[in-house]
A protein has these predicted regions:
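N-terminal, active-site-proximal structural segment of metallo-dependent hydrolase catalytic domains
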Residues: 1-48, 53-56, 63-66, 254-255
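Active-site beta-strand/loop signature of hydrolases that rely on acidic residues for catalysis
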Residues: 3-7, 22-42, 103, 129-151, ...
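Structured beta-strand-rich core segments of catalytic domains in phosphoester-bond hydrolases
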Residues: 35-109
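Metal-dependent phosphoesterases centered on the DNase I-like endonuclease/exonuclease/phosphatase
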Residues: 50, 123-215
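Conserved beta strand-loop-helix elements of the APE1-like EEP
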Residues: 61-77, 196, 204-226
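Active-site beta-strand termini and strand-to-loop segments that position acidic
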Residues: 70-72, 95-99, 221-222, 241, ...
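Surface-exposed cleft-lining segments at the edges of enzyme active sites
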Residues: 82-83, 107-122, 158-163
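Low-complexity, intrinsically disordered Gly/Pro/Thr-rich segments
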Residues: 227-236
Length: 255
């Protein structure tokens, strides 16, 4: 099973890129962030993407917004989509795929305008993850978490002490989340890559130089071994967003 996440930085500007990409790579589950549109503002091409069960959770006034798409050949009946209690500003959508695995598409606040609100969101997300695992559930968290986990996840020229996205307190919450029973799939499969970036500042050709940050993640439950990651790629060739898609491939045990 292929599960992908992408901060599109405006789906209306990236419509054809999104459609071309999913038809090229055929992910079974797609999580989008920062769609910057309400469902009413989307074209029929997007709302009726025929290969998928589609759920658009758009923010007001073209702000924020996430979506989730489940391939019909993977999930034969329309899954139930919903929002956990910690969802604010249309930042989270969840569903359960075959096998009882809960998938989240998450867009964590950047924190530039209200850093305490970002920490509150991350703490609530941590509590949610802990609750799922306490009930024996399995979870895949996909999205733009707006935190570079360690200094290795930031290009040396972009490392700035005290910069939002690199602060010890936000990193500590992300680390507690992982320690609560998640695995950072990109790092599990590529532990020493110091150029594994998913976001680049949009100036001076920094994407071409791969001078970026790793802000986009696929995190999966590590207990139970129902979810066995076998590949995770940053698709830097896709689209013109300042983020690249990340696609992980899992072998899902049937028991």
């Amino acid at each position: 099973m292929k599960i992908a996440t992408w901060n599109v930085n405006g789906i209306r500007a990236r419509e054809s890129q999104f459609v071309d990409w999913v038809r090229r790579d055929s992910p079974d589950v797609v999580c989008l962030q920062e769609i910057k549109a309400t469902p009413e503002q989307l074209s029929e091409t997007l709302t009726m993407l025929p290969e998928y069960w589609n759920y658009w959770h758009g923010g007001p006034k073209g702000y924020s917004g996430v979506s989730l798409h489940v391939r019909k050949s993977t999930h034969t009946t329309r899954p139930r989509f919903g929002h956990p209690d910690f969802d604010v500003e249309c930042r989270v959508v969840q569903t359960e795929i075959d096998g009882g695995v809960v998938v989240l598409s998450v867009y964590v606040p950047n924190g530039g305008k209200d850093y305490p609100a970002k920490l509150k969101f991350l703490e609530a997300m941590l509590a949610y993850v802990e609750g799922v695992h306490a009930r024996g559930g399995q979870l895949i968290v996909c999205g733009d978490l707006n935190v570079a986990r360690t200094d290795v996840d930031v290009h040396p020229k972009e490392r700035k002490p005290g910069a939002i996205g690199q602060r010890p307190d936000e990193r500590a919450i992300l680390e507690r989340m992982i320690e609560s029973g998640l695995q950072d799939v990109g790092r599990v499969l590529d532990p020493t890559n110091d150029r594994l970036f998913t976001w680049w500042p949009p100036w001076r050709g920094l994407r071409q130089k791969n001078q970026g940050w790793r802000l986009d993640y696929v995190l999966s439950s590590s207990a139970g071994r129902r979810l066995d990651p076998i590949e995770c790629r940053v698709l830097a060739d896709v689209g013109t967003s300042d983020h690249a898609p990340v696609m992980a491939t899992f072998q899902l045990a049937t028991t």
